[in-house]
Amino acid sequence: MLSFYYGEECPHCHHMMPIVDKLIGEGKEINKLETWHNEENAGKLEKADGGRCGGVPFFHNTDTDQFICGAANESRIRDWADGRKSE
């Protein structure tokens, strides 16, 4: 499962949203979970993060346990979504 955790007012998250939406449009199933105004999603983020990053944006691929802390370029996000390790 692919999850993108974000905050509604987070500028870095807003920068990532077009890339995430593009991948969704191409058929990737990515769960978008707002965490700043949704306590349930905030709890999911805390569990998924496990103290590795401590904030948003946070990308987690549960199939590979790969994660990205913070903003990243499209190539890195694609690698994450495809389960490939990025350089």
Can you annotate each of these PLM segments?
Residues 58-87:
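Non-catalytic, surface beta->alpha helical segment in thiol-disulfide oxidoreductase systems
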Residues 10-13, 53, 69:
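Disulfide-bonded cysteines in secreted/extracellular proteins and peptides
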Residues 1-31:
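Local sequence-structure signature of Cys/Sec-based thiol-disulfide redox active-site neighborhoods
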Residues 21, 25-28, 50, 82, ...:
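Sec-exported extracytoplasmic/periplasmic mature domains
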Residues 35-46:
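Structural microenvironment flanking redox-active thiols in thiol-disulfide oxidoreductases
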Residues 33-35, 70:
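Conserved beta-strand termini and adjacent loop/short-helix elements that scaffold enzyme active sites
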Residues 16-19, 41, 73, 77:
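Stable alpha-helical elements in mature extracytoplasmic
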Residues 46-62:
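Structural micro-motif
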